Structure formats: C-alpha cells, structure tokens
A protein has these predicted regions:
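Charged structural interfaces that engage phosphate-rich ligands
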Residues: 1-577
Length: 577
C-alpha cells in the first residue's frame, strides 16, 4: 500500500510485492570460510555437550554470560567424530565455489538500493496482516509526534535519564545479590552496561482501521507505538522480571495462550442456548493506559495469592517500578519520557499487562450480579458468552467501562457470529433451542496472505514447511471440512501469485489429507515423550555449502558413537542479510 507521494517504478513495485521477508540471492565466493567457522562453533558445542553431560539442562544457571573463549580438550570426544571434522575442514579447503542464480533482476536490485537510500519515505510492514506500507517520512513523523504530544502519556525531556536509571537498578541488584537471590555471575549479567543503547520509538501503521477514521483520512493511518528496548540499561533486567511474571500470567483463569488454546477452552461450551450472545471486547491502548501505581498494587496482590519463597517480591517490585518510571527514549534527536503505562517492546510488558487486567477483571466481577458464563482474554482482546439478555449486557459493559478510569473497551455484540483473533466463532443452527458453536478461519480485510515468495533465497524444505503448517492451522481452526477446503483455496490463490506452482500446492495438501485419513498426522495425537537432545549446526544458507553440510550431518548421524547417543543433530539456517 503506497501512501506516499513517491511514485513507484515498475521495478520498485516488483521488488516490494515480493514482501519484506524476501531474501535476494546471497552470492559470495567466501562462503567456505564462513562455513568453516560455523563448523568449528558446532564442534565446540559438541565438546561442551560432552563435558557437561552429567549436569543436564535443568541445572543450567539462568541469566549468566556464556564463556565464549574456553573450549574443552578435543580428546574427550570419540576419535571418529574429531576425524570427521578434520576431513570436512580439509574438504572445504579444496572445495570448488560457485555462484548462485539471481532471483531478482538487475533493475530490481537497483530499485532495492534506491528504496533503501530514499530518506523521503518509510517502508514498514502493517500492524496486522502482511501488507507492505510506504509512507512519506514527514507523515510517519507526524503520526508519532501526534502521539508524543499527549501529555498524559509522554513528556519531553532535555536530557536522557537512563544513566540515573542504571544507577538505581544497580543498587537493587546489589541488594538481590546480598540477599542470595542472584549469584555474582547473574549480577554481572543483569548489571546495566557502561554504554547502554538509548531506546528508540517506532510505529507500525494500523491500516486495518477504517480510512475515514485515520488522523488524516486515507493518508496517515494511526500507528502502534513500539519502543525498542534492546541493549538498553534494563534489557537484561526485563528478562529477569519476565522470568517471574510470565508463569503467573499463564496461570490465570482468563488467560489465552493462542488461537488453538482458545479452541480447546471453547470446547467446554460445546452447545449453548439459542439466545446466547457472542461478544468481543477490545481494550483501547491497554499498554499505555495502565496506571502504574495501580499496576504495582495488582502485582503485589498476585504475588500474595501465589507465594514463592524463591521470588524476591519486594525487590522485584522495585525493579519493575524503576524500569517503568525510567522508560525514556529517543526520537528525531529529542528525548522523551513515557509517564503512563508501559511500552510494547519491553519483554515483561505483555505479562505485566495481563496480570493488571486479571486483577481488574476479578474485582469488577465481584461487584456484578450477572457475569458471562464464558470469559477469556488474549492480552487486550476479550471473548465472552452471555445468557442474561441484551439490556443486562449493555449495563455490564457500561459498568466495566467505568470501573477503572484508565481502561476503556470497544465492543462488538452479535447473536450469531463474531471474529476473534484469527477465527470466526458462529452458531451452527441459530434457530435451534441448543446450538453448536463452530469456528472457521478469519481473514482480516488487510491480510494479503503474503507468506514467503517462492523465489526467496531459502532452503527448499522451507517452502513446503510453510504451506503445510498453514494447511494444518486451517484444519485445526475449521469445525467443518467445507470451511477448511474453502480457506485453503483462498490461501492457494494467494500463493499462486507468489509463484508457487499449483502442482506443488496440491501435492502438499494431498499428502496432508492422506495423513489425516491414516491418523499419522503429527499433532493429531498425543506427542510421545522425546528425550533426545537437539544439537543444531547453525550456518548461513548458501547453495554451494548446502551439499557439504547435508553430507557432513548425514555421516555424523551414521557414526556408532556413544558420544552422540541421545542426541539429534539438525541444521539451522540463520537469516541472510
């Protein structure tokens, strides 16, 4: 979607239509050097796995820096393994390199460089769906400034406060170490770095919102604000906080993990009365609207409800308080401070918001005579089933909207069907006294089903895996086989435009249907207990090195070595840049 004043050339349009996850051909003659280094790292991983085999993953200390320099003596490994590595190194020294085919034209490659260097436009992925959105840089900044000028949420500051925040966090970490809650190594890992990276704000355009409701109708869409916390003074501390908050959030009665978890929970309401109303609620700007004073009180209640002697409640709340109050960031050369709620981008933000909403829900329900007989929430999206009539429901929602001053809801009520997450929940027989609740895949209007272009520079098995996983997802989300076939047809039409052949797609679906019929589909039956430890050889994908890696892994698997017993060696490819 081009919202900018820049007129895209044919080549620019062609390269953008491939999607932002498209990888141009990685064409270098030095891939053997990189592969040799990756093999050495994998060799070291095998040595470390052997050296620490008696300790197990359960005893591994969390929140510590790994020692990247020390390597155990090679003699602890079976000689046949070391010999295999030596032969592979020697083979790579004499390996004949070759160039890969080009998956974009010369004009498209030039267009890509031109788009990268164009400072007048910003290219982003849409907030929902897979659309590529091009905006004028000035329009993009206008939307961010519109949000920043809300004094309730943000405050302009003359200088960064993260150096002061780092000092406060370091003092709390020292108390944690003295109290025995963290080790000296963990304290080193969690301590803010001497030169932390300033946080930066960016937005993802919400083009799924009605264009007439945009800040500048049909021109500047609202943006979802995200503050990048990576390498900041509190980044590792956020990991530590999330270690305690996330398990608590997952234990709450209203919690939904994902769409599949939602379907499992919905099975408890298999049949509902015909007068049942289906409702979805959306919390408006939940992250930024949390009152942090109230949020910390909510966390204290959760901690008291779920006591854990290994959890440093008081000091943990101190860490959270300092992290929330010190959330400054840089935008366009100016520092700003978020003074309300938390920001998407902070690791513990989803768990914090979840627990805050849990307490709000619990307290509100205690004040009501009538409540939903089914109530579940995924972050800021709520699904309810209601049997007490529309007037009572409207009173319930109005009271919910006024219960917590900072939290407001947008509702959708329907007697037959509603869309929630990526599913549509509907009544099978709306006029029957008791009706079955069914589900099918929901496609948002802006979802272009841009998965991965078939010509992207990825391993071949990646494309089949993506298609099969989507077919499997559609199958699980569809109550009726007719809906499943209908949604896969929509998917296949979109994939054909991304240069997937019809034969390739049909073969994958036919194989999937055979697995369904025979009961051999993975995921359709309980998973067996797997004890094998996965050891990945991580490397950068290149056609020239792929055969070498495959051959080496195959030979390792065939070795009858006790050092490889109970392990499963796989190849993992890092993203090309």
């Amino acid at each position: 979607m081009n919202l900018s004043d820049h007129i895209l050339t044919e080549s620019e349009l062609a390269v953008l239509s491939k999607g932002l996850n498209f990888i141009p051909c990685f064409n270098t003659k030095d891939y053997t050097s990189a592969l040799t280094q990756d093999l050495k790292l994998f060799h070291r991983r095998l040595l470390l796995n052997k050296y620490f085999e008696d300790e197990g993953d359960g005893n591994r200390e969390l929140f510590v820096y790994p020692n990247r320099e020390w390597t155990p003596n090679h003699n602890i490994l079976d000689s046949s393994i070391n010999k295999g590595f030596k032969q592979c190194y020697e083979h790579l020294r004499h390996h004949q390199t070759f160039s890969c085919y080009h998956n974009i034209t010369i004009e498209e490659r030039q267009a890509l460089k031109s788009l990268r260097s164009n400072r007048d436009i910003v290219i982003n992925v849409a907030d929902k769906g897979s659309n590529v959105v091009i905006q004028n840089t000035s329009d993009y900044k206008t939307e961010i400034y519109r949000q920043l000028h809300c004094s309730h949420h943000y405050l302009r500051i003359t200088e960064p406060i993260y150096p002061t925040t780092a000092i406060k966090l370091t003092k709390i970490l020292s108390r944690l170490k003295r109290s025995g809650f963290i080790t000296p190594k963990q304290c080193t890992y969690l301590t803010p770095p001497p030169d932390p990276r300033p946080r930066r704000i960016y937005t993802l355009p919400k083009i799924h919102k009605p264009p007439n409701e945009w800040f500048f109708p049909s021109k500047i869409p609202p943006g979802r604000p995200i503050v990048s916390d990576i390498d900041s003074e509190s980044y590792h501390i956020a990991e530590y906080i999330n270690h305690f908050l996330q398990p608590l959030a997952s234990r709450q009665a209203s919690h939904i993990k994902d769409s599949f978890h939602f379907l499992t929970l919905l099975k408890d309401c298999h049949y509902v009365p015909s007068h049942t109303l289906l409702i979805t609620l959306d919390v408006d700007s939940m992250y930024t609207n949390i009152d942090n004073t109230q949020g910390l009180r909510c966390l204290r209640r959760i901690f008291d409800t779920h006591p854990d002697p290994a959890r440093p409640d008081d000091l943990l709340l101190d860490l959270i308080s300092v992290s929330l109050s010190g959330n400054d960031f840089l935008f366009d050369g100016v520092y700003w401070l978020q003074n309300s709620g938390t920001a998407m981008g902070k690791i513990f933000a989803p768990a914090y918001a979840n627990l805050f909403m849990t307490v709000i829900e619990q307290d509100f329900f205690l004040t009501r005579s009538f409540i939903p007989f089914f109530y579940k929430r995924y972050l800021d999206d709520i699904f309810m089933l209601w049997n007490h009539g529309l007037p009572c429901l409207e009173e319930f929602i109005a009271a919910f909207n006024g219960f917590c001053p900072s939290i407001k809801f947008k509702q959708l009520i329907d007697p037959v069907s509603v869309d929630f997450l990526d599913v549509t929940v509907f009544k099978h027989s709306p006029l029957a006294p008791q009706t079955l609740l069914c589900t099918k895949v929901h496609f948002k209007v802006t979802n272009t089903l841009q998965l991965l272009h078939r010509h992207s520079f990825h391993p071949k098995h990646t494309f089949a895996g993506i298609v099969r996983s989507q077919i499997y997802r559609y199958y699980r989300l569809s109550s009726n086989i007719e809906d499943f076939h209908s949604t896969t047809s929509i998917l296949f039409k979109a994939l054909r435009r991304q240069h997937y052949s019809a034969r390739f797609l049909l073969l994958i679906k036919e194989r999937f249907m055979r697995d369904i019929a025979s009961g051999t589909l993975i995921g359709s039956r309980p998973k067996p207990h797997v004890t094998a430890q996965i050891l990945p050889l991580v490397t950068t994908f290149h056609l020239g090195s792929n055969s070498v890696v495959s051959c080496f892994i195959r030979e390792l698997r065939q070795l009858d070595s006790p050092d490889l017993a109970g392990t499963r060696i796989v190849t993992a490819y890092r993203r090309n840049k």
